[in-house]
From Swiss-Prot:
Signal peptide: none annotated. Catalyzes a salvage reaction resulting in the formation of AMP, that is energically less costly than de novo synthesis. Its EC number is 2.4.2.7. This is Adenine phosphoribosyltransferase. It is an enzyme of class 2 (transferase). Pathway: Purine metabolism; AMP biosynthesis via salvage pathway; AMP from adenine: step 1/1. Keywords: Cytoplasm, Glycosyltransferase, Purine salvage, Transferase. Homodimer. Its main location: cytoplasm. GO terms for molecular function: adenine binding; adenine phosphoribosyltransferase activity; AMP binding.
Length: 182
């Protein structure tokens, strides 16, 4: 049954060819967010997976991870903490850099956003090369969190990110996958 629900989500995601550059197919979750039934199904897939786990917080990766992460935290009666792009948080922060195709980027969190030993679920919308998610995992661990699992709506396994994440020992859950050429 979960497969049917995941397939509904997958069918609702819009594929935009040649955006933002030629040869890239962008996976757009906004149709999922616009349709209350499908958005509810998406959130329920995550809720049913995590409702019996002993979690303390949900962390969401900037920016679309905020949408799903905050709603999921609310549904699970947990706190939510943002993992932001560099220079977006007003208080004391700690950062983790990661490599991009043409340079570096960084994610940040407030130094007081998690406590040592807290069990955290990390959420984002999509995993491609895995750089942002890996940096967020490292950042949470540096702050003392136990990253129970990383989760995303979409996995693009042919880009290698999901394999890199699981290679760290962090379990990974994704609602749907797209293979190259899908």
């Amino acid at each position: 049954m979960q497969t049917d629900y995941a397939e509904l989500v997958r069918r609702t995601i819009r594929s935009v060819p040649d955006w933002p550059t030629p040869g890239v197919t962008f996976r757009d979750i906004t149709p999922v967010l616009q349709d209350p039934r499908t958005f509810r199904v998406l959130i329920d897939l995550f809720v049913y997976r995590y409702m019996r786990q002993r979690l303390d917080l949900v962390a969401g990766v900037d920016a679309r991870g905020f949408i799903v992460g905050a709603v999921l935290a609310h549904e699970l009666n947990l706190g939510f903490v943002p993992v932001r792009k560099k220079s977006k948080l007003p208080y004391r922060t700690v950062a983790e850099e990661y490599s991009l195709e043409y340079g570096n980027a960084a994610v940040e969190m407030h130094t007081d956003s998690v406590r040592t030993g807290q069990r955290v679920l990390l959420v984002d919308d999509l995993i491609d090369t895995g750089g942002t998610m890996l940096a967020a995992i490292k950042l949470l661990q540096r702050l003392g969190a136990n990253v129970v699992e990383a989760a995303a709506i979409i996995d693009l396994p042919y880009l290698g990110g999901s394999a890199q994440i699981t290679a760290t020992g962090t379990p990974l859950y994704t609602v749907c996958q797209y293979q190259e050429g899908d």
